[in-house]
Amino acid sequence: MSENVEQTQTKKLELKYDIYQPFGPSVLKVRMPQQFVNSLNVEGDRILHDEKLSKEHDWSHNLAGNVKKEVMIDVNKIPRIREFLGSMSQAYYRHTIKQEPAPGSKVAFRSWIVSQYAGDFNPMHIHDANLSGVAFLKMPPGFDEEYAKEDHHKTAGCLEFLGSMPNHFANHSYLVKPEVGDFYLFPSWLTHQVYPFRSEGERRSFAFNVHFTMDNPVKGVDV
């Protein structure tokens, strides 16, 4: 909801009005602390740069992406990352459900790192969870220049959320230009995709699913 003031030209009336957005999903955005980005990149380097580990951790058969590598990582082995994910998931829950999670509820995470190069993309898809999220860890050195040179709809390397059918007076998509450290959390059923890019170098992101387990589920929350 936003409060606005409009002055009419004919009668010089000052009219206060509100605009509500009562429908549609919410997307949480926060800046991930640099030390967390560093920790995830260290773990990513450890697996991605080792062919044996890359094969052992390969998660691509469970995902939709047409990308270089997708490898599973265990955030339980990086406590501060797990705590951060838990904190953001609880914040999203409180904001959307308007109450605290039920006593005894638990949160579980499944996470992976996506390593993309020129021409790689991720088609439209959804996730099988309650919430899903992404954090951007690396971008190709020439990406900003490539993005700036696009002379029409700028989509290179972007993440796009697709929320509804196109219609008048309603946004049906939300385009995100990736910035290292930006973190997004959203409902797992929200369709999204990643566009290809041409720049040399790696576009690396951290992706995850959130599963809530509750002793006393809240009405309207599918767990």
Region roles according to the model:
Residues S2-P101, W112, G119-N122:
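Non-heme Fe(II)/2-oxoglutarate
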Residues F109-L185, Y195, E202, F212, ...:
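Catalytic core of non-heme Fe(II) oxygenases with the double-stranded beta-helix
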Residues S205:
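A domain-level signal for the structural core that forms small-molecule/cofactor-binding pockets
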